[in-house]
Amino acid sequence: MEFAVSGLLARSQLASGQPADARRTIEVLRECFAERGLTRFLPNMDAMLCRIDMHTGDLDAADAWYREKAPREPTHLNVMRRYQYLTQAMVELADGRPDAALLTLAPLEPYIQNCARIIDGIHLNVLTAIALHRKRDEGWRERLTAALDAAAEYRFIRTVSVYGTAVLPLLETLDWDGNKAWRKRLMAAVRTQAAFYPHFLEPRLAPGEELTPTELQILHLLCADKSNAEIAQIMDVKLPTVKTHVSHILDKLDVKRRAEARTAAKKLRLIPDDL
């Protein structure tokens, strides 16, 4: 009960543009629970702190949670960790990996449908819609429509508006024929969240800066300390072509030297940590 009340308070504080207060609410509760040995609640508290980090733009902290505490077990679903799975998908979206987010979300779908988890289903559909939209897959319209239909039926606003700037362009594009009064309230709430947190779930690489498949292959070889000549031989392309690709890669990663590219690529999860 104590966790539920504090969680509601923190979400209300976050929605009101008070992320520092929301963080303090969860951190104080976490410390109290840890002292009392109530460790089973701590993973969800850590996931909630991760969401606050993403709202405030601290993606390094969010990445630390992802590396150290995210479930990352797509073949072994634990429904008690669904809040953490949803958080994991959010980090993956912020990292510019919509495919990874979809892989994380997919196992939740049968459970959510079979057990009629309405709120979880809305979150699942909104996050799936955002991921599909970023993949330029028109299937996002169906998923967002399903989320809006369910949210409107129960008069939920915050369940959708929490995604703020990440869902705003989708809502502006979607031709949804549901309750107009409710939609007006929703759009106002979404715009408020977008104003409070303008970079929430925004990919680190803008669409025009995303690496092409060829550039990703060359990046892997570059980070494996292959020379331009070796890359040209492996890729079966001319040396000037490799040099052009390397130049584009460095520009997109906003670095000057090849050595810096590896660090930037790991931070963006474009290459494995052990490469």
Regions found by a protein language model. Give the residues of each.
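TPR/TPR-like (Sel1-like) alpha-helical repeat modules
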Residues: 140-156, 176, 187, 191
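Alpha-solenoid helical repeat architecture
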Residues: 1-9, 17, 33-48, 72-87, ...
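TPR-repeat structural position
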Residues: 19, 39, 59, 98, ...
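Inward-facing hydrophobic residues that define packing positions of alpha-helical scaffold repeats
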Residues: 26, 65-67, 104-106, 112, ...
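Helix-turn-helix DNA-binding segment
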Residues: 198-247, 251-252, 260-275
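Structural motif corresponding to the intra-repeat A-B loop/turn of tetratricopeptide repeats
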Residues: 16, 56, 95, 133-135
